[in-house]
């Protein structure tokens, strides 16, 4: 990767990351105000939304070939990277353990991982539908 492309990638990721982080703050604040602090609804919501959108964008942008490269930097690496948060997920698990709510750790992780996988696949299926490509998630039975 040459220097110009590297700097362009960095700027696109930073721009998308700024918007994604801001969006995470807004969603988290709204859900905290609505549902309170008993469960990390904001982190769960942004991680599931991010999973769905990432699945969709991965398929949709892949169909654009090299033309989708800059959009991938901006939207997937930047926006979705800024929106979703693994560190908050882990920190909230630690808070559950320290507040004698250890059972919530398992529930929270299971919900996040299982629904995250479901949402990324649903997003990919929607991307395949929009791109009219039914081969996206098919299993190659010849291998």
Swiss-Prot record:
Pfam families: CRCB. Fluoride-specific ion channel. Important for reducing fluoride concentration in the cell, thus reducing its toxicity. It is a multi-pass membrane protein. GO terms for biological process: cellular detoxification of fluoride. This is Fluoride-specific ion channel FluC. The gene is fluC. Its main location: membrane. HAMAP family: FluC (MF_00454). Na(+) is not transported, but it plays an essential structural role and its presence is essential for fluoride channel function.
């Amino acid at each position: 990767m040459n220097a110009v492309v590297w700097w362009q990638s960095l700027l696109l990721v930073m721009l998308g990351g700024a918007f994604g982080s801001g969006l995470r703050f807004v969603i988290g604040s709204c859900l905290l105000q609505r549902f309170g602090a008993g469960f990390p609804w904001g982190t769960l919501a942004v991680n599931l939304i991010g999973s769905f959108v990432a699945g969709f964008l991965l398929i949709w942008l892949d169909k654009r070939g090299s033309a989708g490269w800059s959009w991938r930097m901006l939207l997937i690496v930047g926006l979705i990277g800024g929106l979703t948060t693994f560190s908050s997920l882990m920190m909230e698990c630690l808070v559950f353990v320290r507040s004698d709510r250890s059972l919530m750790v398992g529930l929270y992780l299971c919900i996040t991982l299982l629904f995250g996988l479901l949402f990324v696949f649903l997003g990919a299926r929607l991307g395949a539908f929009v791109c009219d490509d039914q081969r996206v998630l098919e299993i190659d039975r010849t291998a």
